[in-house]
C-alpha cells in the first residue's frame, strides 16, 4: 500500500470506478472506507523502501508499486513481473515546478530547459528508471527503457 494519500486513494477510486480527480466528498469517503478494509485483509507495509526490499528479495509475492521502481527491481530480480489492473492506472511523470516566490526564476527556468535537452533527459530517465515526458526520450530506440511496457505502456488509458 502506498504511503502517500494521493496514490493510495487513486487505487481505491479505480476499484470503485471513480474519477481519480473527483471533488465529491462522498467519493473520498467511500474510497477511505475501502482503504480501511484492506488493513484487516492483508499484511500492509506502508514504507515504500520496505516494500521495494521485500519485492526485490522475493519475500513478497505482489505489491502495488511505481513502474520506474519496478523496472529497477526487475534488473535485480528477473523473476518479477508487472501488470496494469483492468480498473486503470494513473500515468505519472516526474515534474519540475518553480515556486512563485523563487528568488532565481531565470536560473530555475534554465535548469528545467537543460534537463529537457534530449540527451540530458534520456540520461536522467535511464538513471532514475522513470518515464520522461520528453517525446524524444520515449521514442529513442537506443534507450534502455525503450519498449518497457511498465514505464511506457503501449496503450494509453483514457
Which residues does each predicted region cover?
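Extracytoplasmic ligand-binding site segments that recognize negatively charged/polar headgroups
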Residues: 1-56
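Structural recognition of the beta-strand scaffold that forms the well-ordered cores
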Residues: 1-2, 10, 44-45, 61-65, ...
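Solvent-exposed loop/turn segments at secondary-structure junctions
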Residues: 5-8, 68-71, 88-90, 103
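Short, hydrophobic alpha-helical packing/hinge segments within bilobed ligand-binding/sensory domains
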Residues: 51-54, 70, 108, 121
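A ligand-binding cleft/hinge motif common to bilobed small-molecule-binding domains
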Residues: 56, 62-79, 128
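Extended hydrophobic/aromatic segments used for targeting, binding, or gating
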Residues: 79-84, 88-93
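Mature extracytoplasmic/periplasmic domains
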Residues: 90, 94, 99-157
Amino acid at each position: 500500500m502506498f504511503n502517500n494519500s494521493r496514490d493510495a486513494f487513486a487505487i481505491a477510486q479505480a476499484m470503485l470506478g471513480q474519477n481519480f480527480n473527483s471533488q465529491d466528498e462522498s467519493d473520498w469517503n467511500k474510497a477511505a472506507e475501502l482503504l480501511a478494509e484492506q488493513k484487516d485483509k492483508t499484511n500492509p507495509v506502508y514504507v515504500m523502501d520496505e516494500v521495494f526490499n521485500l519485492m526485490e528479495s522475493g519475500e513478497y509475492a505482489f505489491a502495488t508499486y511505481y513502474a520506474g521502481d519496478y523496472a529497477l527491481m526487475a534488473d535485480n530480480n528477473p523473476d518479477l513481473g508487472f501488470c496494469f489492473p483492468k480498473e486503470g492506472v494513473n500515468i505519472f511523470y516526474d515534474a519540475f515546478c518553480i515556486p512563485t516566490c523563487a528568488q532565481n526564476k531565470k536560473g530555475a527556468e534554465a535548469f528545467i530547459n537543460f534537463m529537457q535537452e534530449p540527451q540530458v533527459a534520456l540520461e536522467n530517465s535511464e538513471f532514475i528508471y522513470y518515464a520522461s515526458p520528453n517525446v524524444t526520450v520515449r521514442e529513442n530506440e537506443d534507450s534502455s527503457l525503450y519498449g518497457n511496457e511498465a514505464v511506457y505502456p503501449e496503450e494509453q488509458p483514457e
